[in-house]
Amino acid sequence: MALYSKKTDLSSASSGGYTGVADVYQFWNYHHRGDGNIGDKPSYTLEQARDQITRGNVTWNGENVFGKPAALTYSFLQSVSDANMPDNYKGFVKFNAAQIQQARLALQSWADVANVTFTEVKNPQQATIKFGNYTLTSDGHTDNNSQAFGFYPGNWKWAGSAWFNYNQADNQRPDINEFGRNTLAHEIGHTLGLYHPGDYDASDGNPGYKDVTYAEDTRQFSIMSYWNEGYTGGDFHGYHAAGPLMDDIAAIQKLYGANMTTRTGDTVYGFHSNTDRDFYTATDSKTPLIFSVWDAGGNDTFDFSGYSSNQRISLISGTFSDVGDLKGNVSIAAGAVIENAIGGSGNDVIVGNLSDNHIDGGAGNDVLYGDGGADILTGGAGKDIFVYAWEKDSLASAPDTITDFQRGEDKIDLSAFNKNHDLQFVDHFSGAGNEVLLNWDGQANQTNMWMHLSGHSSADFLVNIVGTALQPSDFIV
């Protein structure tokens, strides 16, 4: 389903002169999926991608056993002889301290989103998941080519084990946002039953994006993918995700169920994060954030206030945001709800959802769209545009509040309602419909913007604008 399917077709409203609606309309179509082809590849819905990544139908609960929790153990191998190494690799090296620390963090990222628990045990023979390094090929030569491999769930000796080429520097130091940490999370995905999104493998020929089954097989959508996010319009500036992404979360939740105990309080992602997860946390304006958020409850906030770039922030489940000068680097997993957003000092576009959102644009010339719900909208410094595009964006029974409208600087964009150029500002409603009435409430110190769209006896639409008496010139129609 298109993200804008329930709303007015804005294509005509967004053509011609500039409107805030134009930015919102473009953002609604951002990374739209599941409808036709992208280039010569079919575009998959989230559900289709989920099923593709889980096409092996294997879990630690058995084949074709879905949605059942799993209590797993893990261990770090201490010694393996060449004769006992899997796939004829040789030259065992045990995990170093940095690898152990980062492996624990990578395991936690999977446990956060699905009903899988991981308990560390000392004896590898008692462990479900085992970690080790290799250094040599089957003929005893130093392996400078391969990266890592992992085995799916099963009942044979090395099922659920993950192996890493210790000759690769990024495997020795798998830091946040680097390929080594990404590789850890990827291989753990295999040990839990996830496949590559396409039928390719680094050990089989020289695969490329030409070999993908569907267009969204990139590292923007899935940590299980081999392919650069640029193929789907993302840009991570050479950085990498450290935990499961949107399609991975859907896939692992299919296998083991969703973890509904994860972050049920009021959680902040980005700056001032209280997640206790490094990949959800920004410490300064140079921090690259690459994540898909899973959150099981509370009143939650995207805080991207420390960035000065022009950002596009979406609070709609299943969509992407452009955060901190990257593109398509933040997403919200299906079923998760984030209620609030704080922009930075650039010219941001922020789109809310059907919850009661609190959206703060920060400095810069921002475009804010609250969508449904009783939203609180704060533009901040700069020339801001507050967009309304749907008759249910601000109901009379649950109105939005604009907290800091500045006459001569800010605008309220109603052009989506004026496609036929019949929206009128009036002193009183006539019952004809498509009328806007501005009423100054001195006691409340606000302008009440009423709209009578349908022509029946009561107003359909109300926005409260604090602190100033508005005139028709304050609107884009």
What are these regions (language model features)?
Residues 79-81, 124, 135-138, 169-170, ...:
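Acidic glycine-/aspartate-rich tracts in secreted/extracellular proteins
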Residues 14, 91, 171-179, 202-216, ...:
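Acidic, glycine-rich calcium-binding repeat modules characteristic of RTX/beta-roll
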Residues 328, 335, 339, 429-477:
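Low-complexity acidic/polar repeat-biased segments
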Residues 1-95:
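Disordered inhibitory propeptide/activation segment of secreted metzincin zinc metalloprotease zymogens
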Residues 28-69, 98-219, 226-235, 284-288, ...:
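Metzincin-family zinc-dependent endopeptidase catalytic domain
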Residues 298, 335-346:
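Parallel beta-helix/beta-solenoid
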Residues 71-73, 77, 82, 140, ...:
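GD-rich hexapeptide-repeat beta-solenoids
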